[in-house]
């Protein structure tokens, strides 16, 4: 048994812990209530929260207050327009390590908002600096450009894009440092001038977007690469559009798209502002002018010829000529970036194409300007057409943008017109007769169905009348009526049901039909007969049928068993005890040996009997002759033993000589064949000498 644990009893409310007596008898321990445990947990959590607040507010061990590490975010146009300043969160959910000191070269140390930096940002935003005004004006002018690039997925010079995101959105602190503002304004100016997107690696996960700002040296190197690749990109854009879109419809479709995307006043203002800002950047202009001159040499041929054809005969313009002309204007070495263009670039393609087209129109003083202006005016007039045509133009442009030239499919061999159907041949006389017969049968059936419908209508009306008349019987006295008697015969005919009359008519007609057998039709069909004039072959005709009278079962009688009856001396137990002489003992042993030999002989004979019945009879005679001397010897010995000592012997009825002289007769009995197990048992008993002697059944009889 486990010993009981002594425990303190529960005290009452008024008692103290010291007054409670120690019990002599052990009791169960007191269980604490769940409410007390919950109260302890609440008190502990409140203490921990207070300690956390103290650590955050006063710092840990005299160090600076804990500030979450944040990275700067790309400044968007909407934030510049609204001039929003986002403060850092007051208290993070989990305390973090104190921020390491960083050098002045990195932009992260400048842009991260700490305790002092947040105040500086507020002061800078309150007092609008001239640099900030320029920045906001530039962003307002390029609102549409920033809207198209809100995804902030920026290209790396190698042509790849890296996008990562963090969990929480970070506030963008702008206006606090003039160096950062200058860099941002330079990048925006480059965007307006038609350069690539700002060279910043955006790191974006599913929830948050941050940027890794680079040093000035890296930025200068990347800017040079982008400027060198700028003209090649414009060439690739122009050539790709010239490959897919016909030159006659190029300007019209671009004008329609710009009209749909942006209103005409806004588009003009944006283009004028962008051109004004490009004039300020002299370095970019020098590079562009050199590249544009090379473009002008290749483009005029592709613009002049199809434009004239389109104005004069737009419907008869063949597709093959335009494709050949476009191939001439293509550059031999397109840039790699035109091949691996992202979907964002494909969306911005119409804007860049419009800008490049405007620049070419101003600087190229060739007669192509007149044709392009006329087509642009026509496109503005056609912009008011229904939306179905615009959608068709878009679908055509999308198909051509994929690089598939739209050509009308003209089959080599057109199908011939089918002639009139062949006139059917006249049917034979038998078919015509069969068709007439079917037609007559159908007409007869149709007439019968109409007659039955008329008869049924009359029957319904007559049934209603007869029921009404039967209900009125006895109410009105008529001539010839007797109270309690049947109605007169004239009335009875009228009051009869039509069904009864119809049944009477059918019964009379059936009687007449049965009386005269001539009215019945012979419905029997002729017997199906085979072809005549052919005979069976002689082999089949001369065959004789074999009649088997016997069933095929035969009865055979044979002897399966044989019984041989022999007399034998049986000794009782008392007699054996009395006669213990050696002579008698030897004689009994000799007799047993002789009996065993005889049994073996009999077994051999039984095995040979199964072969042939004749051999069995011969062997039986031999055995009888051989057994006679043996039996005589036995009789002599028995007489000697009887003369020597009196022995009680159970002898069957009749003398021994009669029994011995009688030959075994052949008897057939209906005995079941013993099983193999029984045979083995009998053999074992015979060998051991335990089998009953052959004289015992005679004693029983």
Swiss-Prot record:
Cellular component annotations (GO), alphabetically ordered: actin cortical patch
Compositional bias per record (Low complexity), positions renumbered to this chain: 337-346
Spans annotated as Disordered: 1-35, 53-177, 203-546, 589-701
Comp. bias intervals (Acidic residues): 589-599
Basic residues composition bias: residue spans: 524-537
Keywords, in A-Z order: Cytoplasm, Cytoskeleton
UniProt cross-references to Pfam families, sorted A to Z: Aim21
Tagged with keyword Cytoplasm: yes
InterPro entries with a match to the protein in the record: Aim21 (IPR021582)
Nucleus among keywords: no
Coiled coil: none
Function: Involved in mitochondrial migration along actin filaments.
Family: Belongs to the AIM21 family.
Name of the protein in question: Altered inheritance of mitochondria protein 21
Organism lineage: Eukaryota, Fungi, Dikarya, Ascomycota, Saccharomycotina
């Amino acid at each position: 048994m486990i010993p009981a644990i002594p425990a303190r009893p529960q005290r009452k409310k008024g008692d103290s812990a010291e007054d409670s007596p120690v019990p002599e008898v052990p009791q169960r321990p007191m269980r604490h209530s769940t409410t007390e445990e919950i109260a302890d947990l609440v008190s502990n959590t409140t203490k921990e929260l207070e300690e956390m607040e103290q650590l955050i507010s006063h710092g840990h061990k005299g160090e600076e207050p804990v500030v979450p590490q944040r990275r700067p975010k790309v400044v968007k146009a909407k934030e510049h327009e609204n001039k929003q300043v986002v403060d850092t969160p007051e208290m993070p959910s989990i305390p973090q390590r104190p921020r390491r000191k960083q050098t002045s070269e990195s932009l992260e140390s400048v842009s991260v908002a700490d305790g002092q930096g947040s105040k500086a940002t507020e002061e800078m935003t309150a007092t609008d600096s001239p640099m900030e005004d320029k920045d906001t004006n530039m962003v307002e002018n390029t609102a549409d450009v920033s809207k198209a690039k809100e995804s902030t997925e920026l290209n790396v010079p190698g042509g790849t894009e890296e996008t990562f995101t963090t969990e929480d959105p970070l506030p963008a602190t702008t206006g606090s440092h003039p160096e950062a503002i200058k860099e941002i304004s330079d990048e925006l100016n480059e965007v307006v001038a038609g350069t690539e997107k700002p060279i910043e690696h955006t790191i974006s996960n599913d929830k948050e977007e941050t940027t890794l700002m680079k040093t000035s040296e890296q930025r200068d190197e990347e800017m040079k690469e982008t400027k060198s690749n700028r003209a090649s990109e414009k060439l690739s854009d122009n050539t790709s559009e010239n490959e897919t879109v016909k030159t006659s419809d190029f300007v019209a479709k671009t004008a329609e798209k710009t009209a749909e995307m942006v209103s005409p006043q806004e588009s003009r203002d944006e283009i004028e502002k962008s051109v004004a800002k490009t004039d300020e950047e002299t370095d970019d202009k020098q590079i562009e002018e050199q590249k544009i001159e090379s473009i002008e040499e290749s483009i005029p041929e592709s613009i002049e010829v199809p434009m004239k054809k389109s104005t004069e005969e737009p419907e008869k313009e063949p597709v093959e000529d335009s494709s050949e002309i476009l191939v001439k204007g293509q550059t031999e070495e397109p840039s790699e970036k035109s091949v691996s263009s992202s979907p964002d670039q494909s969306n911005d393609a119409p804007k860049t194409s419009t800008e490049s087209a405007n620049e070419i129109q101003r600087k190229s003083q060739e007669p192509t300007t007149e044709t392009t202006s006329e087509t642009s005016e026509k496109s503005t007039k056609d912009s008011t057409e229904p939306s179905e045509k615009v959608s068709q133009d878009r679908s055509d442009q999308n198909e051509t943008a994929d690089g598939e030239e739209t050509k009308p499919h003209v089959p080599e061999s057109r199908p011939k017109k089918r002639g009139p159907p062949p006139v059917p041949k006249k049917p034979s006389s038998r078919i015509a007769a069969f068709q007439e017969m079917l037609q007559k049968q159908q007409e007869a059936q149709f007439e019968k169905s109409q007659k039955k419908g008329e008869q049924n209508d009359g029957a319904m009306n007559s049934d209603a009348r007869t029921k009404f008349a039967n209900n009125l019987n006895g109410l009105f006295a008529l001539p010839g009526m007797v109270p309690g008697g049947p109605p007169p015969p004239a009335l009875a005919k009228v009051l009869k049901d039509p069904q009864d009359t119809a049944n009477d008519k059918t019964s009379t007609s059936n009687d007449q039909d049965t009386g005269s057998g001539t009215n019945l039709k012979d419905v029997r069909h002729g017997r199906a007969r085979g072809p005549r004039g052919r005979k069976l072959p002689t082999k089949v005709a001369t065959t004789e049928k074999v009649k088997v009278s016997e069933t095929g079962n035969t009865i055979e009688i044979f002897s399966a068993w044989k019984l041989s009856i022999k007399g034998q001396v049986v000794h009782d137990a008392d007699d054996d005890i009395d006669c213990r002489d050696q002579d008698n003992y030897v004689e009994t042993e000799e007799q047993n040996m002789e009996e065993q030999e005889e049994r073996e002989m009999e077994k051999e004979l039984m095995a040979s009997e199964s072969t042939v019945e004749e051999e069995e009879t011969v062997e039986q005679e031999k055995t009888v002759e051989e057994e006679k001397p043996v039996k005589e010897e036995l009789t002599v010995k028995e007489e000697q033993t009887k003369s020597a000592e009196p022995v009680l012997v159970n002898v069957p009825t009749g003398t021994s000589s009669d029994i011995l002289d009688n030959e075994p007769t052949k008897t057939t009995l209906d005995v079941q064949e013993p099983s193999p197990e029984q045979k083995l048992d009998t053999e074992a008993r015979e060998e051991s000498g335990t089998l009953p002697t052959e004289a015992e059944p005679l004693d029983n009889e």
